Amino acid sequence: MNAQWGTFRRKGSVHDLLVEAEDAMRGQGYQVANPVSNNNSMVMGGNDSVLAQATATSTGPEETYLIVSAFSQDASTAEQARNTVRDGIKDLYNL
């Protein structure tokens, strides 16, 4: 099993940023097993080749700390999934 992960901060609420992560997963055709509507801190989805997860917590007014992880038998597949989900999460507010 190969794992890829990264941490970063974005401007926006936990909920709104996780919705962006979920949208990025759905955009890749992933089945979302734990949608944002079922929880308030994590979204998870994947397919037969990869599992991706985005976890978030608030670090201040309109700022969120995120961890995006992906797991696959193939390191390249895990890396691509992590990057795709991460890149789908944009700053929602200008500083």
Give a label for each model feature.
Residues 26-38, 91, 95:
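Short secondary-structure junctions
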Residues 5, 48-54:
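Short, surface-exposed coil-to-beta transition loops
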Residues 21-24, 41, 45, 69-72, ...:
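Small-side-chain structural scaffolding
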Residues 57-95:
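C-terminal basic regulatory modules in eukaryotic proteins
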Residues 1-32:
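Terminal, regulation- and interaction-focused segments at domain boundaries
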Residues 17-26, 52-65:
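Short, Lys/Arg-enriched charge-dense amphipathic segments
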Residues 33-50:
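A cross-family detector of function-defining hotspots
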Residues 4, 10, 43-44, 58:
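Intrinsically disordered, low-complexity segments enriched in small/polar residues
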